[in-house]
Amino acid sequence: MVYHCRMQTAWKYEKGVDTMKKQWKIIGALGLSLSLLMSSTALAAHPKGYWPYLSAFNNAKTANNQAQMITTGNKLLQYYQNLPLDSDVASIRYNVNYANYPIYEKQGNYTKAKEALQQVATNGAYLGFHDAVTMANERMRKISPNAQVYALTNTSAPYYGAKHEPKNGTLYGRVWTEQNDSAAQNEAIVSFYIEMGQNAADYERFIAPFEGGDHVIHIAWNFPGEGSTVSAINSGSYDSNIQQTLQYLATIDAPVLLRIGGEMNIWTTATTGDAFKAAYTRIAKQARTICPNVALVFSTNYTSPFGGSMEPYFPDASLVDWVGASLYNNKYQFASSPTKGVDNNEMYFGIGDYADPVKNLSHTADLAKKYNKPIIITEGGSGYLSGYADTTTFAADRIREAYTSLNMVYPQVKAIIHFDRSGSGYDYSLQNNATVQAAYNSALKSNPTLMSSPSQTVTQSFKPLSQVTGANGVVTLRAYCDVIGQTVTVTYSVDGKWVGTQKTVPYNCQLDTSTLTAGNHTLKVVCNAPNGYSQTLNYQLTKAANGSVSFKQA
């Protein structure tokens, strides 16, 4: 029955009909602007002398001469740069930048690509191409490499004072099954699915072995009818069941996190923000009284339908202790049809080359930051397939990044739950794939800020290198840099002397500062990718007479 609950939810990640309709809507809007530009009425409205510039750009575009598209496009934009904005000017700027941003991406010039996309968004908004604006804004978020260097420090991560939040460190664990029971016993947090309307006490025989304080227990309280269940809750139909469930949760001898109706932003049977907030509030207010041992979790899917948002569903912040997300990073949209999809589709929904755990969590991180809440990954993973479309390596790489980089880039991530189950589509179970299991184990071992027990004391956290002072001896450096579809190489050097090169996440480097003389030194970190992307991060490393070192980004 718990299996049925999960598989029902998993189907949503494969559902693509609505997504494709939205994508075609974008393509239609983009084509419309070009047809308007080419009409005789529009041509007559353009300023005198424009035609040689426009003709040169159109000829380059027709020939797919990308070098000439950039050159002639820039000349055309320069001709129009000082003209007041109207539909003709906006159409020129929109079309040139829309045609050329993919060329900049291909060259690894993401600064110019984002500048072009910003013009797509600005001029698209003027022209009323709202879907194109949505696409451009999300693409700017997804293509940015966000290169940054971090250091492992003896300082604490941000602490929000939320119920059952570790002051430092990140709890890790998995969704429980009979098959993974022994592994779950050795981790800090364990998750169980319960559906609205069920007798929660029936799960006591599974939950009881994890009581006693050695584990945090996460309850994913799902709404089986999705939006229709929300309506029933608001009508009072589930009041008795809600009270019984909360009374049971009050008896659990362990810290409890309760996810109330997760993933509401992608439900097939949709609900409104106001309706969901009313249902959440109806449950949460009772929970505050009946089971004060329970922390309340508001948890969405990591991405919303095209043009959608998590924000409309967020209830009163006083009724939310943690902000959560379901975070799945898969190679293909459909496990049943493992083929590459439309690029903008995969970009928007974080699939394939865009399935980066850090970037896919960015919308959730923005929401949590706004309301000063810790983050929990309430379920997630990277599924693997076998046979001709084997995605084992892809899945292992994403698992490795999730457990080495998520709480480095987002130190407010205080819990991660792996969806350790198999199904008819993607398989997320660790025990069924030795390569994925090894990546999971290796990542856990390499990250000293991950907690195998809620009682574990974590004394370290990752900080952006530019914020590090008072370090000494060997300093552990790591980097984050995601270049779409590329293998990144990170090279470290001090005063021109090579220190290390890494090609796998988290690009670890052990910098022995004891070998440096007192005074100022230059640490250079270079991120390269085969498509031509290159970014150099320079830091002034200052070593004091007592041996302590500090870093300042140049």
Positions of predicted regions on the chain:
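Long, low-complexity serine/threonine/glycine- and acidic-rich segments characteristic of extracellular
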Residues: V458-S548
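Glycoside hydrolase catalytic-domain groove-lining segments
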Residues: Y203-A220, Y328-S386
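Aromatic-lined carbohydrate-recognition surfaces of secreted/lumenal glycan-active proteins
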Residues: R288-S309, N372-L385, H418-R421
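Sec-dependent signal peptide cleavage junction
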Residues: M38-K48
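Substrate-binding cleft of secreted/luminal carbohydrate-active enzymes
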Residues: G128, V149-A151, V256, P374-V458
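Substrate-binding cleft of extracellular glycoside hydrolase catalytic domains
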Residues: G197-S299
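Aromatic- and acid-rich polysaccharide-binding/catalytic face
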Residues: Q185-I194, E311-D353, F419-D420
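N-terminal substrate-binding region of glycoside hydrolase catalytic domains
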Residues: K61, Y80, P84, P145-S237, ...
